């Protein structure tokens, strides 16, 4: 299992770059927003993934964090410093390590 714990920078479609922190909790990689946006604010989970399968779910919400929900997704590990989270039918975000 690659070591993904730490801070990452991602470019969200239509938004500025955002910083997330990945932690390993209860056997899952949990990505929490350090900087947020009008849909999913700082402090909220943006995605969570089973490290053994890279299958998980990403959080979506309307503006103002209305009707938040999780949709299927998966994580693609390109290298130790680049990953992509794919929201099923909603696009993707590429992240790079913030070191």
Describe the predicted segments one by one.
Residues 1-99:
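Soluble ligand-binding/transfer domains with enclosed cavities or grooves
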């Amino acid at each position: 299992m690659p070591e993904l714990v730490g801070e990452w920078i991602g470019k969200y479609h239509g938004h500025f770059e955002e910083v997330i922190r990945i932690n390993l909790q209860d056997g899952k990689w949990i990505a929490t927003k350090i900087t947020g946006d009008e849909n999913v604010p700082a402090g909220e989970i943006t995605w969570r993934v089973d490290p053994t399968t890279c299958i998980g779910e990403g959080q979506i919400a309307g503006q103002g964090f209305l009707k938040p929900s999780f949709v299927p997704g998966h994580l693609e590990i390109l290298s130790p410093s680049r990953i992509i989270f794919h929201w099923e039918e909603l696009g993707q975000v590429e992240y790079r390590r913030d070191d």
